[in-house]
Amino acid sequence: MNKKSWILIAAAVVLGAIYIIHFSNWFKPKIMTIAHNGRFGQINFTLGSPYKLTAIKVVSVSELESNKYALPVWELKSDSNSVPTKLFSYGARIRGMKPAIADTEPQPLIAGMTYRLFVEAGSLKAQHDFTPADDPRARNRARPAN
């Protein structure tokens, strides 16, 4: 091979490396996205894609502002190997996870109070604030009959 061939090969390798770095997701950090939906009195959380969750914790934001170590209203830890999960509901059981403190139940959420959800999946961590709304079904049951 002559000098011109080596230069063309080097240019192709450099252009290939530039393409891979700028137009692929190989070197971009993974970002976990969380959304919530509070229909019918139940809060459902959706993750951007399925993750093997290692920890879930829900804490009141007002308590978190006054106390760095606020007690969670709901906390789950992975005991060994959780199932890849994309959707879960507040207080529901998730396969492969159990309460951080044995025999504890999730506390009921107070409507209008802001809570923060912390989710961990290995080295990935994310948080999401949400405010539960009043359950319209409960309001309809509470109305007096005319």
Regions found by a protein language model. Name each.
Residues 104-111, 137-139:
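Short beta-strand segments and strand-loop junctions that repeat across beta-rich extracellular domains
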Residues 107-109, 114-132:
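Short, exposed beta-strand-loop hairpins at the edges of beta-sheets
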Residues 4-22:
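Hydrophobic membrane-insertion alpha-helices, especially the h-region
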Residues 65-104:
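Extended, solvent-exposed segments with strong compositional bias
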Residues 19-70, 129-146:
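N-terminal non-catalytic regions of secreted/periplasmic and cell-surface proteins
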Residues 9, 16, 64, 80, ...:
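Alpha-helical interaction segments
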